[in-house]
Amino acid sequence: IPAFFADYVLSHRGRVVAKASVSRNFRFPTLNDLYFLPGGNPDLKREHGVSYDGGVSFAVGRGGSYSLHGEATWFDSYIDDWIVWLPTFKGFWTPKNIKEVHAYGVELKAGLDWQPAPDWQLNADGNFSWTPSINNGDPVDWYDKAIGKQLVYIPEYSASVTGRLTYRSWRFIYKWCYYSERFTTSDNSMKTKIGRVKPYFM
């Protein structure tokens, strides 16, 4: 699969690095996508498209004491024949191809490693994602309102924080996650209570 990657050191102090890439991507339907009963679709096409991304990362710290690192990335993908499972009126789900999807957004990551004492270590990681995934295909019918809408079950925003406190062989882990609302219908309809999954924490 053709791909091009480039890194450039902006500053040795703080290890600031700019990164960029472009790639052509393919994904074939899985056996479940094709033959699962009921609902498999043997007529599915493979996904294919082009992805671009660029970003910057840094890392600072003091050996044996602490380190702090972070990264910000922008990405932009154009995918044809995106495979998505959708409910049917027959009571089961089936996969179908969406002619064109534009997925883009920003991802932020940061992490801290700190050793305050020989037997103690604290690690913390956090990330935030803004990931619109828009159906840009052709309408299936004249009344199709799914074009220009967010894909089903994909949250536009998500975030998580993980903390780990280690003392010798003991470890305490805490994880917090957030997901924004997700639509359950391809036209993002809010007419019924089951038209979306409300934002939630866990």
What are these regions (language model features)?
Residues I1, V22, L37, T131, ...:
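Transmembrane beta-strand segments that form the barrel wall of outer-membrane beta-barrel proteins
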Residues I1, F36-L44, G91-I98, Y143-Q150, ...:
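Extracellular loop and loop/strand-boundary signature of outer-membrane beta-barrel proteins
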Residues P29-G39, V84-F92, G137-D144, E181-N188:
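Flexible, solvent-exposed coil segments and beta strand-coil junctions
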Residues P2-F4, A18, G40-P42, V50-G54, ...:
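Hydrophobic, lipid-facing positions within transmembrane beta-strands of outer-membrane proteins
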Residues S67-Y78, K96-S186:
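Gram-negative outer-membrane beta-barrel transporters
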Residues V9-S11, K19-S21, R27, E47-D113, ...:
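Membrane-embedded beta-barrel scaffold of Gram-negative outer-membrane proteins
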Residues I1-G14, F28:
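Signature of Gram-negative outer-membrane beta-barrel scaffolds
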Residues H12, R24, L165-S169:
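A generic beta-sheet turn/junction motif
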